[in-house]
Design a protein with these regions (language model features):
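Glycine-rich phosphate/diphosphate-binding loop of Rossmann-like nucleotide-binding domains
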Residues: 6-45, 152-240, 287
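Short glycine-/small-residue-rich Rossmann-like dinucleotide-binding loops
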Residues: 69, 75-76, 95-96, 221, ...
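Generic hydrophobic/aromatic pocket-lining and core-packing "Φ" positions
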Residues: 23, 47, 82, 104, ...
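An N-terminal-biased, well-structured beta-alpha scaffold segment characteristic
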Residues: 2-106, 110
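Adenosine-phosphate binding glycine-rich loop
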Residues: 118-159, 269, 274-366
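Residue-level detector of alpha-helix initiation sites
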Residues: 76, 136, 177-178
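Glycine/serine-rich phosphate-binding loop and adjoining beta1-alpha1 elements at the start
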Residues: 2, 8, 79-169, 298-300
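Rossmann-like adenosine-cofactor binding region
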Residues: 209-291
């Protein structure tokens, strides 16, 4: 198969769909790989690194799309990229369609087969291609939150871990999944006062066993969330409904009760965000303030630590890329129902039911 890797063009997105090591694996399996010039420069891979392992460097994204059957990316295709997709193309990348109807309609119009990293499943029901970026975003959320709590950034002027004689900051983490647990690990490492909220009692028990006395856990009812945001200096939104839009857990009314200079970090912004006042921001302009509360809602948080993120993502995606290249999309999905769960769009139709429901579009099973 002919596989293409275009340079990412989303704002401040430095990751790359395939590292030279991943390209080497594809070439060794008999596939051709076309890489847009400078695609790897964001993580310090020059074109020569790709050429050494057998890739062909092409000057533009248009050349990548023209020469390739499968397009491997990191973030959702931008309008100029969607315009280059054809029915013959297989697109493998993060899509997050539930919060992006224009993208969904563009992909439907293209006729391409689009498999989303974030809805590929594993035998255990986990999301193996979302996990590495959730780990990164969870850990980053505490770094970011601590930064914006500084007075110079407009924050409350609070040190997460406090000092002897001064209480630490209270951190409320909404969601005890992969992002939430990684946020908790970072926050407890800084000696913050951490509580994780979730609606799954079994998960809360697991978290209690994992962290012991270093955190508190609580069931995520409306009342407990309202009290949590009122008391917390830092709130992390880390909820996920696979494929669907994130639930709005923190309302505008709750926001008005929060301390001035406190910080919200919405990891779920890719899926529409879990705060009523959330709107997607960029690394160029990452925060805004409503009712005295700082909102950080950057939709590609891991892009800020591109090298770590790119390697972590490639470790997870490579086996699936190889399977798709070796067998073709139809045969690969027929053989692997967990990969088939990643199919979001094909033949001009929405193939993922939660996505269709979120966008109020027709769901047509593959």
């Amino acid at each position: 198969m002919r596989v293409g890797v275009p340079k990412e063009i989303k704002n401040h997105e430095y990751r790359v769909g395939m590292t030279p090591a991943s390209v080497a694996e594809l070439v060794a399996s008999g596939h051709e790989v076309f890489v847009e010039t400078m695609a790897g420069m964001g993580i310090d891979f020059e074109d020569s690194a790709y050429e050494k392992v057998g890739a062909t460097i092409v000057p533009t994204a248009a050349d990548v799309f023209k020469n390739s059957d499968m397009i491997v990316k990191v973030k959702e295709p931008q309008p100029v990229e969607i315009a280059m997709l054809e029915p013959r193309h297989l697109l493998f990348t993060y899509l997050h369609l539930a919060a992006d109807k224009p993208q969904a309609e563009g992909l439907m119009k293209s006729g391409a087969t689009c498999i989303a990293y974030e809805t590929v499943t594993s035998r255990s029901g986990a999301l193996p291609l979302l996990k590495p970026m959730s780990e990164v975003a969870g850990r980053m959320s505490i770094q970011v939150g601590a930064h914006y709590l500084e007075k110079e950034q407009g924050g409350r002027g609070v040190l997460l871990g406090g000092v002897p004689g001064v209480a630490p900051a209270k951190v409320a983490i909404l969601g005890g999944g992969v992002a939430g647990i990684n946020a908790a690990q970072m926050a407890t490492g800084q000696r913050a006062d951490v509580t994780i909220y979730d609606i799954n009692n079994d998960r809360l028990a697991e978290l209690d066993m994992h962290f012991g006395s270093t955190i508190k856990t609580a069931f995520a009812s409306k009342a407990t969330i309202a009290q949590a945001v009122k008391e917390a200096e830092l709130v992390i939104g880390a909820v996920l409904v696979p494929g669907a839009a994130a639930p709005k857990l923190v309302t505008r009314a709750m926001l008005k009760t929060m301390k001035r200079g406190s910080v919200l970090v919405d990891i779920a912004i890719d899926q529409g965000g879990c705060f009523e006042t959330s709107r997607a921001t960029t690394h160029d302009d990452p925060v805004y303030t409503i009712d005295g509360v700082i909102h950080y809602c950057v939709a590609n948080m891991p892009g800020a630590v591109a090298r770590t993120s790119a390697f972590a993502l490639n470790n997870a995606t490579l086996p699936f890329i190889l399977k798709l290249a070796n067998l073709g999309a139809d045969a690969a999905m027929a053989e692997d129902p967990h990969l088939a769960a990643g199919l979001n769009v094909s033949g001009g139709k929405i193939r993922n039911e939660p996505v269709a429901e979120a966008l109020e579009l027709e769901f047509v099973p593959a």
